[in-house]
């Protein structure tokens, strides 16, 4: 199970014992100090991997004296699809703003005069990487439910999952450049490649998922936005 760390927002992956209960799962915490238990009290969204398949889940505290949660797996109907589409655009907008803030640091003045540039960029990168990792982990879980509701989206969803892995590796490379003492020109070049790849990823996702989630149809074949 993956939860968002209640203090840092970073993804926390924990192996937990779940008990099926109809279409739901029950998970019990040994004590109040269990990190994942505190995470779910702060934010009830989780990604539950069952037999290698990720599922988006919403955690509801158990009633009575039992310490744990009922995990409701995501199901996509018309109303939920529209809500997912709206939230997707909100998340993409937030991530684009963080990218813009990092680019502003790069464009803020001559590199030679900006001794704090690397530190500032690293701060933006850490924030962005944590947010993006959490976004993609939750998407991977949601994709399972979206594919069940919209089988025609299967090719696009598989491509998006592969791109999540590519983006993760590219961000690790960028982080390594920022942590080191290499040329900041190389940092800018890598940053622009990452930013361009992410924008292409966001645009492809929006072009292929939003029509189906909003009930306006599924493309006959995956759409690759031009431009």
Name these PLM-found stretches.
Residues 1-30, 124:
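Short beta-strand segments
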Residues 30-31, 44-46, 161-163, 227:
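Short, charged/polar low-complexity linear motifs in solvent-exposed/disordered segments
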Residues 22-24, 31-76:
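Short, structured beta-strand-loop surface elements
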Residues 9-10, 28-29, 37-40, 135:
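Short histidine-centered beta-strand/loop micro-motifs
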Residues 8-10, 34, 47, 66, ...:
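A broad, structure-centric signal for solvent-exposed, well-ordered loop/edge residues
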